[in-house]
């Protein structure tokens, strides 16, 4: 039991300012508008930042138009979007903080092993936010909720890159 108490304190420390229920609802609602556009989301990231595409061995050096409609691209896009969907679905509930922390920490560890830099995480964030701004109802409240969510996510993931 002591272990879980210590783990909970570590999670709260790492995610010092978890999303409120209202912020989580805003993020979930906006994500629900695009989460089935997996291929378009990943294509937007690759189009904006070809250096990210180059980190994927199965897509490196290939023309985006030639891979966008392939099963491999759709499968990988679905994996990425599903990760976000899982984290978002757990957000806004204090009882889920340790699960969110574990998922996001593993994301950082896995990407460190692949040589992904903090700058590339930042590029992905920029491309994702640009996609969201263009495809969901976007206002100051949505921007603030997403920034809070991504700040928390990146604080944990980037700690694993150190």
From Swiss-Prot:
Residues 18-162 form the Globin domain. Gene3D superfamilies: Globins. The keyword Ribosomal protein does not apply. The keyword RNA-binding does not apply. GO terms for molecular function: heme binding; metal ion binding; oxygen binding; oxygen carrier activity. Residues 1-16 form the signal peptide. Disulfide bonds: none annotated. It comes from the Eukaryota. Heme b binds at residues 76, 111. GO terms for cellular component: extracellular region; hemoglobin complex. Keywords: Heme, Iron, Metal-binding, Oxygen transport, Signal, Transport. Homodimer. Belongs to the globin family. There are at least 12 different components in Midge globin. There are at least nine genes for VIIB variants. This is Globin CTT-VIIB-7. The gene is CTT-7B7.
């Amino acid at each position: 039991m002591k272990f879980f108490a210590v783990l909970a304190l570590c999670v709260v420390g790492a995610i010092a300012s978890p999303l409120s229920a209202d912020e989580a609802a805003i993020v979930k609602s906006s994500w629900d508008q695009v989460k089935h556009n997996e291929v378009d989301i990943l294509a937007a990231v690759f189009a904006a930042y070809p250096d990210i595409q180059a980190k994927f061995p199965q897509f490196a050096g290939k023309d985006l138009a030639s891979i966008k409609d392939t099963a491999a691209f759709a499968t990988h896009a679905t994996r990425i979007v599903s990760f976000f969907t899982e984290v978002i679905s757990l957000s806004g509930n204090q009882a889920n903080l340790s699960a969110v922390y574990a998922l996001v920490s593993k994301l950082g560890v896995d990407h460190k092993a692949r040589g992904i830099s903090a700058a590339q995480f930042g590029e992905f964030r920029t491309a994702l936010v640009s996609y969201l701004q263009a495809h969901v109802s976007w206002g100051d409240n949505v921007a603030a909720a997403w920034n809070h969510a991504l700040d928390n996510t990146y604080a944990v993931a980037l700690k694993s890159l150190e």
